[in-house]
Design a protein with these regions (language model features):
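Catalytic cores of secreted/periplasmic lytic hydrolases that degrade extracellular macromolecules
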Residues: 1-167
Length: 167
């Protein structure tokens, strides 16, 4: 089993829960986590439970959000710090859902991982090039689409809609 597959297996439940809640493909969430956190091994992931490289905004800090200081694109940047990896996954989903620049993503089907990857890149999620291509490669090489299929089948069988809270 590859490190990417180990990461996916460890965090698939979080990604699938986010797919049910927000309609974001689990495969894309996992691929972003793999890429952004170096399979959960980056300093940011290990020290702050931040698996998606989300920076701490002034509103995050004003609301009492914790943060760590790291050098990324610039020295001494503030990154969100979370109590758990699950909190990181939830904040990542809310970050995409509540940020208008990602609105186009939510017009796509929850199982359209290629469209989602391209739309996330187009909206400017990452500063590096070929972001969508890298996400798709991670998804396809590690069979992460199986998590999307599992959630799609489950939601269809239960007659449930994505993006609607279910008790």
């Amino acid at each position: 089993m590859t490190k990417n597959q180990e990461y996916a297996l460890q965090y698939a439940d979080y990604a699938m829960a986010q797919m049910r809640r927000y309609g974001i493909p689990a495969s894309v969430t996992l691929a972003q986590g793999i890429l952004e956190s170096s399979n959960g091994q980056s300093r940011l992931a290990r020290n702050e439970n931040n698996h998606f490289g989300i920076k701490a905004t002034s509103s995050w800090i004003a609301e009492g959000g914790k943060y760590g200081i790291y050098t990324d694109d610039k020295p001494n940047e503030k990154f969100c710090s979370y109590d758990s990896v699950g909190d990181s996954y939830e904040h990542h989903s809310r970050f995409l859902k509540e940020n208008s620049r990602y609105a186009g993503c939510f017009k796509l089907s929850p199982d359209d991982y290629k469209g989602w990857a391209q739309s996330i890149e187009k909206a400017g999620y990452a500063t590096g090039g070929k972001y969508a291509e890298n996400l798709q490669k991670i998804i396809e090489q590690n069979g992460l689409q199986k998590y999307d299929r599992q959630v799609m089948q489950e939601m269809t069988a239960q007659g449930r809609q994505f993006g609607v809270e279910h008790n």
